Amino acid sequence: MPDYKRWFGDGGTYFFTIITYDRRKIFDNPIAQEILHQVIKEVQAKHPFKIQGIVLLPDHIHCIWNMPQDDNYSLRWRLIKSKFTKLWFANGGSDKKVSLSRTKRSERGVWQRRFWEHLIRSQKDFAKHMDYIHYNPVKHGYVKCPHQWKYSTFHRWVKNEIYPENWLCQCNENCKKPDFENIKNSIGE
């Protein structure tokens, strides 16, 4: 397991899982990827937070944020989701037909209504969730090795010498799959 030097900030450190409506693979689309990147930067500029780790998969996002003291992550996710949805439609994106209750609330079929959050409580908790983020594309069968997935902070952590490039690489015959059993109740997947 990598050796993390810093894991929390003043307002808390949180792991999030954000899922698209009905698990639509919206983020297979490069336009959606770019819109999400743009919207996150916009929201960060007005409502600062630090992204410690993130992975973008076709139908969901996992990330770890450091929050400012006494601040609100729900506001940030609401803004990210709503701004993304507006820009997604403005750029020709579509949504999925939604239930009557969603229609009554003027909700679109882009995001699941809520998100999953977990307060990181220790260095070990941080490390396990960060490992989960970086291993997630392998878990879902998109790649054999974390370094093969470009939509992840794994590469930044390798560059900073926190992870070796061949970390949990399934190309390595001696590599054991990680066990995330002890955090399964905190990942929301």
Annotate the PLM regions.
Residues 1-189:
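Short catalytic/metal-binding and nucleic-acid-binding patches
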